[in-house]
A protein has these predicted regions:
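Metal-dependent phosphoester/phosphodiester hydrolase catalytic core
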Residues: 3-361
Length: 361
């Protein structure tokens, strides 16, 4: 995380250190987030982001489109992002935290078998100015957790790594047919376009890897009023064939069960990846009603949204970012969440009582 000089790295062995920033010690009340930023394209969305004067901005992955096994090429893509005027202003004025997804990991839909993952990890951590002594540099991946604020107003930011240890995806069987041609034909016929994968039935398949699962269990024991779980792919969307937690149904349920077992209140999922924005909700087989606010992309757009039976909103298919505003009022604290387009218009918004995100005693 850049911007906060000393933030508790929740249940880690050290405290992360960074350059001094005037936001130090402030309660987090205005948080923005986004994903999917093509560094070679204009990025006018930053004007709208900056106008909000956020306490924190969270990058959810595909922060650049590297798609390369050459670390020098990947670093050059980050240099393009750094040269974007809006991004540069963001970095100067607002604390930033980041996780990666496949395209800044290095290859489309890649997981644990990606051979250049260590090189990509170094490029990622260097660009986001991770301190040399950070626990993040010692882990099997780039996952991290931060705790900001005083008791009664604590925000925990959980950044899981959904690439470094993830089991390879299981391709759809098309009897030799080409997926791209098959998908184009469906779209031309006005039909939804399922993704190219099926659920992985292997009981040993994993999203996080066992070491990261144990780390996550410890994070959910840390006292916090609000937990922002920043997932690079959707957590609550039902299975569509595209990348999501639903590709690994056992791990998806394991996540919900872990939240229940740890009595971890205040979880709100933030996600990206899909090139449109939506809100998903799940209230079956979960410890309390769970929400997943998806914002995608900062530059990228997709006009054919996939069916999602857990969708609780319309779809915004224009460039966008998401926000979480917290009105801290003790037991009456409320979250205002929503989606803003590149022109600064709030396209969707909702209010959620923080007390509704409370695990049963």
């Amino acid at each position: 995380m850049t911007g906060f000089p000393r933030i508790s790295a929740a249940r880690d062995s050290i405290v992360t250190a960074s350059d001094p920033h005037p936001a130090l010690g402030r309660t987090l009340s205005r948080i923005a987030f986004g994903s999917c930023a093509e560094s070679s394209k204009p990025q006018p969305v930053w004007d709208a982001v900056l106008a909000r004067k956020n306490d924190l901005f969270v990058f959810l992955g595909d922060n650049v489109y590297g798609d390369t096994r050459d670390p020098a090429v990947l670093a050059a893509k980050y240099a393009e992002l750094a040269a974007q005027p809006g991004f540069a202003r963001l970095r100067e004025t607002t604390p930033v935290a980041a996780i990666w997804d496949d395209h800044d990991y290095g290859e489309n839909d890649a997981g644990a078998d990606y051979p250049m993952k260590e090189a990509s990890r170094k490029v990622f951590l260097d660009f986001w100015r991770e301190p040399a002594g950070s626990p993040r540099r010692q882990r099997d991946g780039v996952y991290a957790s931060y705790l900001v604020g005083e008791p009664g107003r604590r925000v925990q930011l959980i950044l899981p790594d959904l690439r470094y240890n993830r089991t390879p995806l299981t391709p759809m069987e098309l009897n030799g047919a080409d997926y791209d041609a098959w998908a184009r034909a469906r779209v031309a016929a006005g039909l939804p376009q399922p993704g190219p994968y099926v659920r992985n039935p292997d009981p040993k398949a994993t999203m996080l890897g066992e070491r990261q699962w144990q780390w996550l269990a410890r994070q959910l024991e840390v006292p916090a009023e609000l937990r922002l779980f920043a997932s690079s792919v959707q957590v609550l969307a039902d299975f569509t064939g595209w990348e999501a937690w639903a590709n690994f149904a056992r791990d998806q349920q394991r996540l919900f069960d872990l939240i229940r077992r740890k009595r971890a209140s205040g979880v709100l999922f933030l996600s990206g990846d899909i090139h449109y924005a939506e809100l998903s909700k799940l209230d079956v087989n979960v410890p309390y009603p769970l929400w997943d606010l998806t914002s995608s992309g900062l530059t990228e757009e997709w006009r054919v949204p996939t069916p999602n039976s857990n969708r609780a909103s319309e779809v915004v298919a224009d460039a966008n970012f998401g926000f979480v505003d917290v009105n801290w009022r003790g037991d009456a604290t409320r979250l205002a969440i929503g989606i803003v387009d590149a022109g600064g218009e709030t396209r969707m918004s909702w209010e959620i009582p923080l007390a509704s995100l409370r695990a049963p005693a």
